[in-house]
């Protein structure tokens, strides 16, 4: 739906980007990912707790996605700000989630390959059903008015990220609780 929005004509509320302009945006997203995952994530995990970085990444990514349809065509360069939030958020979330899963599975004696395989499997399902849901919502609302416009799929994505952050907070709370119980026993 990102491309559907950026390629949509400015008269319809989009940015009117062509393939080359969209390519530059995706190159920017890739560059930001390299900077975060290739250079900064190690320093950040030394400075901050991984669980906090994971939640910050989830919230940041959600804000970036939810902000996409609010980029005005006359200031289309702001799509880079939304894209930066998305790639920074993903760059914080993805490696910290994998590390936390590795530590937790090792601590609980689970088979690491099974846990990481499940993570990849659920990620693949999200990459299948996420675009299908977004495309479906887009097709239902792109011609709409009022609250039910092309903004809807991005709003729903933002809500999904809020739910994900709340679930992460709950998991971390329960994980810390289980560590406390383990220490007492």
Task: Specify the residue positions occupied by each region the protein language model found.
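Helix-to-loop junctions at the C-terminal end of transmembrane segments
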Residues: 35-50, 138
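Intracellular juxtamembrane helix-capping segments at the cytosolic ends
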Residues: 92-108
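A late C-terminal transmembrane helix in Major Facilitator Superfamily
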Residues: 109-142
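C-terminal ends and interior cores of transmembrane alpha-helices
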Residues: 59-73
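Multi-pass alpha-helical transporter architecture, strongest
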Residues: 68, 155-185
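A membrane-interface helix-boundary motif in multi-pass transporters
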Residues: 18-20, 136-161
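Hydrophobic core of transmembrane alpha-helices in multi-pass small-molecule transporters
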Residues: 76-93
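Loop-to-transmembrane helix entry
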Residues: 11-32
